[in-house]
A protein has these predicted regions:
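Vicinal oxygen chelate
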Residues: 2-4, 63-109
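A short acidic/small-residue loop/turn micro-motif
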Residues: 95-96, 119-121
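Long, continuous compositionally biased terminal/linker segments
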Residues: 32, 36-74, 81
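Glycine-rich acetyl-CoA-binding "A-motif" of GNAT/NAT acetyltransferases
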Residues: 41, 100, 113
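Conserved beta-strand in the GNAT
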Residues: 43-47, 105, 114-118
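Active-site beta-strand termini and strand-to-loop segments that position acidic
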Residues: 34-40, 106-109, 119
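Short hydrophobic alpha-helix segments
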Residues: 25, 90-91, 117
Length: 121
């Protein structure tokens, strides 16, 4: 519910991944929105269009691809420096039955669950 605080957070964590500062693009009904462009992906933060308070999703996670563990660790550290909260296990490699991946989880300042991910082949 503090989009400017969220913008500062995402400017920094997505900056680690090469995104430029969020681009201000209000919608036609006046809500503030910021767009981030990452390679072939776009990420947006916005004030709720219905006028109600924003709430984090229950069971939702937005994942951002990282090229390696070092970048993921930096992404996580920068997130903590800008109001994020570390959740789940510490950043690192997790092994599953059919796959191995690097994961680093945070909650952003609004409580949304995000992670850095690298599939290891």
């Amino acid at each position: 519910n503090d989009i400017e605080k969220s913008k500062i957070f995402y400017d920094n964590v997505l900056g680690v991944l090469g995104a430029k500062e969020g681009v201000f693009m209000p919608n036609l009904t006046g809500q503030t929105r910021y767009f981030y462009f990452l390679d072939k992906n776009t990420f947006c933060i916005t004030e709720p269009i219905d006028g109600n308070e924003a709430h984090p999703g229950n069971g939702n996670t937005v994942a951002f691809n990282v090229p390696d563990e070092e970048t993921g660790n930096k992404w996580h550290a920068v997130g903590l420096e800008h109001g994020g909260i570390s959740i789940e296990e510490n950043p690192g490699i997790r092994e599953f039955e059919n796959m191995k991946m690097y994961l680093a989880y945070l909650k952003d300042p609004s409580g949304n669950k995000i992670c850095a991910i690298k599939i290891i082949k």
